[in-house]
Structure formats: C-alpha cells, structure tokens
C-alpha cells in the first residue's frame, strides 16, 4: 500500500541489532513510517524461520530474547475510517495486551476500521483455552475478520 502512496504506520518493536536495522531500512526504503516502531536497547529482534518438509508442510522455529519493557510507543492519532490491522499471537500476548487494548479502544472511539486476522498457530495450541477470552474480545472489536 505504501508503494502506491497510501500513508502507512506500522506499530511494532525490534531490537537495536543487525536484524532490527534490516527491518527498519526495508520499511524506510518502502516509504513505511518507523515512527511507531519501538527499538529496544536490551534484548534482540525476534526471528522466525520456516522449514518445509517433503510434503511442503511448514515447521517453525522462533528465536526471541525480549526485554522487560515492551512496545514502548506513543500510538498515532487515528481518524475515522483509518484501517487498523491486528493479528497473530502479537494481538493475544498477555505482556502486550494493555497496549493492544489502548490501540483498539482508540480505534473504536475514532470509528476506525479494525481488521483482525487471528492467524492462530499450532505452536500456541496449549494456550488456546486460556487465550479464548482474548480472541473473543478481539473479535468484538473487529469490523472485519479474516
């Protein structure tokens, strides 16, 4: 979308390391604002790797070393009909939940459109029952669900 001139804000976090620098450079090269990306000085950028077996089924390996303070950003000011995309475990993570709710509450107040892609991975299946209320809450905020 940013390549077509649509202004994009990406809210996330990364480490102050080589991986984080590659991500930030890619975003800037593609005209995506990095104003709302928290670059944490402690911890490393998370890395996810996918390996395909003989049946082309993916097996994922996740490497992460997060700091205690997470998603330390001031959110952009949303306006009516802005589109907020949330999803995956990031939108469910109890450590980030308060910050995610802050964004969702602002979206609701300003009448922004919330697109929710649960993208629930089997790597979190043991937490499914515990996370169900959060998934339902995200569905309640959503205008569009993938």
Locate the predicted segments by residue.
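Gly/Ala-rich phosphate-binding loop of Rossmann-like dinucleotide-binding domains
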Residues: 2
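A general structural motif
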Residues: 5, 80-81, 111, 142
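Short beta-strand segments at enzyme active-site cores
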Residues: 5, 10-12, 114-118
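Conserved N-terminal subdomain of the carbohydrate kinase-like
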Residues: 7-88
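Conserved beta-alpha-beta core of the PfkB/ribokinase-like small-molecule kinase fold
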Residues: 90-146
């Amino acid at each position: 979308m940013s390549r077509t001139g649509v202004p994009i804000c990406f809210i996330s976090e990364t480490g102050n390391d080589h991986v984080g620098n590659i991500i930030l450079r890619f975003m800037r090269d593609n005209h995506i604002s990095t104003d709302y990306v928290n670059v944490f000085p402690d911890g490393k950028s998370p890395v996810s790797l996918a390996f395909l077996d003989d049946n082309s089924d993916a097996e994922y390996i996740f490497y992460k070393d997060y700091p205690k303070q997470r998603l330390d950003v001031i959110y952009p000011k949303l306006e009516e009909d802005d589109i907020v995309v949330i999803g995956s475990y990031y939108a469910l993570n109890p450590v980030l939940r308060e910050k995610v709710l802050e964004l969702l509450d602002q979206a609701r107040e300003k009448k922004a459109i919330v697109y929710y892609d649960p993208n629930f991975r089997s790597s979190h299946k043991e937490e499914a029952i515990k996370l169900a209320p959060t998934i339902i809450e995200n569905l309640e905020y959503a205008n569009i669900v993938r």
